[in-house]
Amino acid sequence: MADETNRNVNEQPQAQDMGELLRIRRDKLKVLQEEGRDPFTITRFDVTHHTQDIKDNFDAMEGQAVSVAGRLMSKRGMGKVSFCDLQDKTGRIQIYARKDEMDEDNYNHFKKYDIGDIVGVKGEVFRTQRGEMSVRAHDITLLSKSLRPLPEKFHGLTDKEIRYRQRYVDLIMNPESKRNFEIRSQFVAFLRRYLDGLGFMEVETPVLSPIAGGANARPFITHHNAQDIDMYMRIATELHLKRLIVGGLERVYEVGRIFRNEGMDTKHNPEFTTCELYQAYTNLDGMMDILEGILTGAAKEILGTYHVQWLGHDIDLTPSWQRVTMADVVKNVTGADFMACIGDADKGVELAKSVGVDMDGVAHTWGNALYETFDQKVEETLIQPTFITMYPVEVSPLAKRSPTQPELTERYEMFICGCEMGNAFSELNDPIDQYERFKAQAAKRANGDEEADMMDEDFVMALEYGMPPTGGLGFGIDRCAMMLCGTDSIRDVILFPTMKPLDN
């Protein structure tokens, strides 16, 4: 039988050899089982330390007995002395195995183990003559047999697809990928601590609902067999959370999955994670303070700096961030002064077209003209953290109108590198106004706009009981993780992104 025991992890098995390599490993497993050493019958191995613990505390631990476990990533030598690299969740450490310091059978069995096998090692901490921090093995136990060889590494577009489809292999082979998900996890943990510290209460709201509301998006539809009704996967958590503000909870937030039946690109996945929060007795300014506090605090705690490299730019998260109205930033970038013709649809549309904005397929209103000019000409120029405020009412059906300029709303979106990172309102709490806006959205939906809001009469009824002045904020966990990790694709921060099934 051919032997791949000494194959270094840096050797890439050729496609034509894969069948043979799989057969070899299955044959090895069969021999183990026949000898009564089936690794899959083992249920426990007591680990005393992780590899990074040993490295961080080496001076204090030298000579100390330890038990470590992990995956074999390389093997070197096979005479009386062998070396291997063991990888656990914290990193790698060298294992030093010497025949005359181990049970002879144990050492001979170890020689037959393969790259990718999972082992438990008992030994003592020491440094080799070359100065390598290591564990001197006294006993090595095979805990799980790897029946499929590990690849060398991932590279190129084709291999990037494999990374997303086989994340389990990506995490084994690429420390930077695992680091991305550690940063994401740390960000969510920081977020919860931050909001809990402000007196917010974490809640859970329905994922399935008879009405899809709270955002302009196309929902996924499913069917509830017992009740024989169609239901929607939620496109936002907003309307349920605001019901809780009506109920008197005052400060609530939810970190949860959102589902939108829309296109996919480097910034969008149909299944993604958001945080939405609502606070009674505050407004848009309070929501700006919270989002800025979350992102600056997370960067400082997780990365140790306010400066991050993202999408080719050096992003400075140092407080305080720029705050500017949509009309002002449009004027600054394009020269188009929409406030000079506020409320005049014809002049607004003419102004938008004069700076090259495409208004086809968009209702010709002043507010839409302003928004389309911002969307098409300005958004991509917003590199450093910037709050854009005072959105047109046409694109903000759930935000409170400006008391001095009713064509505009007390809403902001925050942008970094041209990406929308957060969306917040001084929440609309007038049930009569809300009902009229729902009617306008329903009319759009009746005319074929599948992303327009549905009428939600129960939500209007909740507002009729009275909702205090409230600030609301929603932001994507995935995009925040992208920024903190410095990645250019949302798939790099979602463990199992949506992928088109392979033909076979």
Predicted feature descriptions by range:
Residues 115, 121, 233-238, 245-259, ...:
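TRNA-recognition modules of translation machinery and tRNA-sensing kinases, especially anticodon-binding
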Residues 213-219, 297-416, 440-467:
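Metal-assisted phosphate- and nucleotidyl-transfer catalytic regions
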Residues 2-7, 14, 18, 29-35, ...:
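Class II aminoacyl-tRNA synthetase-like tRNA-binding/catalytic domains
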Residues 17-24, 179-183, 232-233, 283-287, ...:
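Catalytic cores of large soluble enzymes that bind and process phosphate-bearing ligands
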Residues 2-18, 44, 224-227, 398-402, ...:
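A short, flexible low-complexity segment enriched in Lys/Arg and Gly/Pro that occurs
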Residues 140, 195, 199, 329, ...:
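Conserved hydrophobic/aromatic pocket- or pore-lining residues that grip, position, or stack substrates
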Residues 89, 129, 333, 416-418:
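Short acidic-glycine loop/turn motifs at beta-strand connectors
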